[in-house]
Amino acid sequence: MLAVVAALMAFPSAIVAGLLIGRYPHSRIGKAINTLGVVAMTLPEFVIATILWLVFSIWIPIFPGVTVVPSNATVLELLPHIWMPALTLAAVVFAHSMRTMKAGVTTIQTMPFVESARLRGTKERVTLLRHILPAAMPPVVNTIAVDAAWLLTGTFVTEAVFNYRGLGRLAIDAISDRDTAIILPIILFGLGVYLTMSLIADMVVRLLDPRLKQQRS
């Protein structure tokens, strides 16, 4: 559930932000978001988690800083405790996807087919959504696939900071106890997740990339 919430928070907003920043790089909002993205990429995960914990649990006590619900808690009981770790993970993957999208838009918008659409009098919004966005998406899809796999398998630092009982904490406890009956399935699950995400990304890229569409036709 933590990975799903973080993905829903990060990926749609990263695509929109990267699209707008790439198209309007000199706007104040664009510069501010881009700066935040750079900071999020350079800071270690535990530092982001600590900053969010200080801000939203100590200075502005909106969310609980530590997960203290039982293992059989319902979704409604877990929701107040999931926002902080989800926001931490979302900040990390948002930065990756946003900057990949920005780089793609910056490159694509100067290409001849985009200039041709503008010369035909196509509205800028239509050009952005119909021509620039699909062409800029393939690298973003690959980035999202890697980040989504990481969200499912590599969140033990955030889970440790917020005492969230997830797959990462389970793996750490199993390694500490040398419990191979748990370690091996977790390793196989991680490998399966990365392979599955890679295959899904490859299929989505083939559907989105205009050059591959032309080759198939």
What are these regions (language model features)?
Residues T35-V66, T88-A95, R99:
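Membrane-water interface segments at the C-terminal ends of transmembrane alpha-helices
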Residues I51, T67-V68, L119, S217:
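Short capping/connector residues at structural and topological boundaries
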Residues M1-I29, E45, A73-S217:
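Alpha-helical transmembrane segments of integral membrane proteins
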Residues P12, V55-V68, E159-R165:
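Peri-membrane helix termini and adjoining interfacial loops of integral membrane proteins
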